[in-house]
Amino acid sequence: MDASVKTLNTEKAKALQAALAQIEKQFGKGTIMRLGEGEVIDDIEVVSTGSLGLDIALGVGGLPRGRVIEIYGPESSGKTTLTLQVIAEMQKLAGTCAFIDAEHALDSQYAQKLGVNLQELLISQPDTGEQALEIVDALVRSGSVDLIVVDSVAALTPKAELEGEMGDSLPGLQARLMSQALRKLTATIKKSNCMVIFINQIRMKIGVMFGSPETTTGGNALKFYASVRLDIRRIGSIKRGEEVIGNETKVKVVKNKVSPPFKTAEFDILFGEGVSREGEIIDLGVIAKVIDKSGAWYAYNGEKIGQGKDNSREFLRENPELAHEIENKIRESLGVALLPSIEIEVPKGTKQAAAGA
């Protein structure tokens, strides 16, 4: 009995090996592999979101490359700001980025303030949804673009809708367009290691009695094809006296195929500046017990940083070395990769000028 089972297993192994060889011959080497061979799952390449808290919540230190990402939320919640920060981070890694501005609403001056290099950014303002997705497909297939942002899915208007009358009913047209495009895109996105971020808006479903009435535009295809889905919300305002200077923002990782989902991150988005790095250092420092909070005062190593978050934020902005030191201590305690030495970041001319002065 044992001998016959062994013979059967040997025959099955030979048949499998022949099938694998045939598949590789027909479709190319690497088309099919065993998961345990090691060459299949490499370390996931990621790009920082520009927010330390969100990078930690994502579980892999940022957004994964070669994947589809969806970022959605209400109006003025920080969707475009977050994607512009991701573009800035990708450009720091010498990556090529493209922005498909279907809404025709990109503020180039604001993008520049967030650290985006406009000279290197590719931008397209397509007329129709089909044109926008054809451009995305061409850029992905080129293999030379590292990040593409589509702003937004709701603005990808099908050609038939644009050419029709104002009152025409064309149900499911945009959903079919997105479904077809994502079927074509997914495989090439993985091969080219290009990250595609779709910004999406929220709509309300009518007549929903139980559960959330909120839904995103463009049908269900994007929900399935996206490896990461981020729900971004404004939860409060940041004031300096009576003046509102920014928004308190909460991001929930609704879906995550590369790490456990449902984690959240909270950070400040300051108008004209983007995600407040110093604000995050203070908040995460208190959580990690690197910074002590007593009443309204914040202290580090027994020395007071400032009274109130706004003053503490300004102090850290004026003392980048200290901010760098605190951030690395936070990263160490939370098990995230440390930042490089600050000497690398500060230009040499600055030190010489300071010494000469």
From Swiss-Prot:
Source species, domain of life: Bacteria
Keyword DNA repair included in the entry's annotation: yes
Database matches in Gene3D superfamilies: P-loop containing nucleotide triphosphate hydrolases
Matches recorded under InterPro entries: AAA+_ATPase, DNA_recomb/repair_RecA, DNA_recomb/repair_RecA_CS, P-loop_NTPase, RecA-like_C, RecA-like_N, RecA_ATP-bd, RecA_C_sf
GO process annotations (BP): DNA recombination; DNA repair; SOS response
Chief site of localization: cytoplasm
PROSITE patterns to which the protein is assigned, alphabetical: RECA_1 (PS00321), RECA_2 (PS50162), RECA_3 (PS50163)
Subcellular location(s) per record: Cytoplasm
The protein, known as: Protein RecA
Organism: Methylibium petroleiphilum (strain ATCC BAA-1232 / LMG 22953 / PM1)
Lineage of source species: Bacteria, Pseudomonadati, Pseudomonadota, Betaproteobacteria, Burkholderiales
